[in-house]
């Protein structure tokens, strides 16, 4: 089934966030998840390896927070970074 425009946009946001998380952890984004996996996440499918094991710890839980509006890519003087509501340093 085709994604809705909103699901496509959410997948793009998740992909951006995944790239930032991967860069932060010095790992290739593809080692964490494929775009297909992110599309599944954007459609509400929670049965993905991205939410389990080391992938879940490194990226999955944060990506769920992105979907809930608790984390988002932020533009800063040093470029893009992923900021979360509980990370006080992202507010300054």
Residue ranges and their predicted role:
Residues 1-92:
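Accessory DNA-binding and partner-docking regions appended to nucleic-acid-acting proteins
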């Amino acid at each position: 089934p085709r994604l809705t425009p909103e699901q496509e946009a959410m997948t793009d946001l998740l992909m951006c966030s995944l790239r930032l998380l991967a860069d932060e952890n010095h790992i290739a984004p593809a080692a964490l998840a494929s775009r297909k996996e992110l599309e599944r996440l954007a459609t509400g499918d929670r049965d993905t390896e991205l939410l389990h094991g080391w992938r879940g710890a490194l990226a999955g839980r944060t990506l769920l927070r992105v979907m809930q509006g608790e984390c988002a890519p932020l533009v800063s003087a040093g470029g893009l970074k992923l900021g979360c509501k509980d990370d006080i340093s992202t507010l300054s």
